[in-house]
A protein has these predicted regions:
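Active-site neighborhoods of enzymes that stabilize oxyanions during catalysis
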Residues: 133-136
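Flexible, polar/low-complexity N-terminal or interdomain linker segments that lie immediately upstream
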Residues: 1-67
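Conserved beta-strand scaffold positions in the cores of enzyme catalytic domains, especially
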Residues: 56, 73-75, 119-121
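Extracytoplasmic/periplasmic/luminal assembly and interaction segments
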Residues: 63-95
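Short loop/edge segments at beta-strand edges and connector loops
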Residues: 43, 77-78, 123
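Catalytic cysteine-centered active loop of the rhodanese-like fold, especially the PTP/DSP P-loop
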Residues: 82, 88-130
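Short glycine/proline-enriched coil/turn segments at helix->beta-strand junctions
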Residues: 51-55, 71, 90-92, 116
Length: 136
């Protein structure tokens, strides 16, 4: 009798873990789909072509930005992005980057919700950037 209860408890623990795992996977898929709708991923060449006529925003934290950033970029860290979103112009394209692209895509979703429509994210982020950089 005791062994049957143990199996029953383990079954429900397994079911709960499976549900949590499924929820996490579904959540990531939703974020991926929303981010693809919010921004276009661009490579270095496309980024370089338009960077002089756009707002370039580095969403890394300030210490990373100070260590080096794309020439002409300004820093709005992801942790403070919602607070400073009002300082971004809607009439100009917005080019976002970071180390990779996950946080930049999340910022793109925020911008899209605020009515921005020209949003781009640098493929590979700062790590893959081969253009001009500014080091402090």
């Amino acid at each position: 009798m005791l062994l049957g209860k143990a199996h029953s408890v383990l079954f429900w623990v397994d079911m709960i873990l499976i549900i949590i795992l499924l929820w996490m996977v579904i959540n990531q898929v939703i974020i991926f789909v929303r981010s693809r709708r919010a921004a276009k991923i661009v490579d270095n060449e496309e980024f370089k072509k338009v960077m002089h006529h756009a707002q370039i925003i580095d969403v890394r934290e300030e210490d990373s930005f100070k260590a080096g950033h794309i020439l002409g970029a300004r820093n709005i860290p992801f942790s403070q992005f919602k607070m400073y979103i009002g300082g971004i112009r809607k009439d100009m394209p917005v080019y976002l980057y970071e180390q990779g692209k996950a946080l930049a895509l999340r910022c793109a979703i925020m911008l899209k919700k605020e009515g921005f429509d020209k949003i781009f994210v640098l493929k590979g982020g700062y790590n893959k950037w081969d253009g001009k950089k500014k080091k402090n």
